[in-house]
From Swiss-Prot:
This is Phosphatase SCO2771. Pfam families: Phosphatase. It comes from the Bacteria. One of its GO terms (molecular function) is phosphatase activity. Its EC number is 3.1.3.-. It is an enzyme of class 3 (hydrolase). Displays phosphatase activity against p-nitrophenyl phosphate (pNPP) in vitro; however, the physiological substrate is unknown. Disruption phenotype: Disruption of this gene does not cause histidine auxotrophy. Keywords: Hydrolase.
């Protein structure tokens, strides 16, 4: 569903709903609530590299933040069926992210890109990295030989990913980002000025003091909680794996145009 050039805000909102990146998304309400409950109950697999302590032990508090920042249904009695992402919140978050990208470009900053959802978001990150490089940023090259229990931490098209069994791997873990930051310190190299990522890659970096922005789905509340607390600079709500990765192209074009990078 291509949109020639860069869409207007209204055109992008329509596109996000039509492709189910936002609007009535594929993730069912019961899955969202299950994840909110598991985070509140201290399941660290849902903390996405962050340290939440006991601050979010009430799942109703988690739901309230998700309603405010993502646009899910705020009714705690709505337990099953359709849930939503507000496209206007997605676009507003993209505009906030664009501001941070502009700052990176103006300062010629060192930027690290990473994704735990390569099937959906790899090219979003690749295109953003290319635009920042053209604007004078240094795109951080990760150390070689990094591993986690899940696989190898590699870099393709300027984007760090996890490789497992000769395949790019879906992961929400913060461990790959831990491996990168630890590896940089071990080599005596400075940490990035900015991390642009998603899921645990963004969460771990933000938790450890690196300016970070990222993408997350409506069933991954941790990044939105971190944004609400000021740990993460921007969390963009979206369905992170729709039918075609090309559906994200208009969103990427809008982001880069807003940042003055296109």
């Amino acid at each position: 569903m291509p949109i020639p050039g860069t869409p207007s805000r209204a055109e992008l909102a329509e596109h996000l709903v039509r492709t189910r990146i936002a609007g009535d998304v594929a993730t069912p309400r019961e899955n969202n609530l299950s994840h909110y409950r598991k985070l509140a109950n201290g399941d660290r697999g849902f903390w996405l590299g962050l340290e939440l302590g006991d601050r979010w032990s009430d799942e109703q508090d988690v739901l309230a933040v998700m309603a405010e920042r993502v646009g899910v249904n705020d009714d705690p009695e709505h337990r099953y069926g359709q849930d939503t992402i507000d496209p206007e919140l997605t676009i507003s978050a993209l505009e906030r992210m664009a501001g941070r990208l502009r700052k990176a470009a103006d300062g010629g900053q060192r930027v690290l890109f990473a994704t735990g959802h390569p099937g959906g978001l790899l090219d979003v990150h690749r295109a953003t990295a290319a635009a920042l490089r053209d604007a004078g940023c240094e795109i951080v090259v990760i150390p070689e030989g990094l591993t986690t229990e899940e696989g190898y931490v590699q870099q393709f098209a300027d984007v760090s990913v996890l490789e497992h069994g000769a395949s790019l791997w879906h992961t929400h873990s913060g461990e790959p980002m831990k491996a990168i930051l630890t590896g940089l310190e071990r080599e005596g190299r400075p940490l990035p000025d900015l991390v642009v990522a998603d899921h645990g890659w963004a969460g771990y970096a933000a938790q450890h003091g690196v300016d970070s922005v990222g993408y997350a789905d409506c069933n991954d509340p941790a990044l939105f909680l971190a944004e609400s607390e000021g740990t993460l600079q921007v969390a963009v709500p979206l369905d992170d794996h729709v039918v075609s990765p090309r559906y994200y192209d208009p969103m990427t074009a809008y982001l880069l145009t807003e940042a003055g990078l296109k």
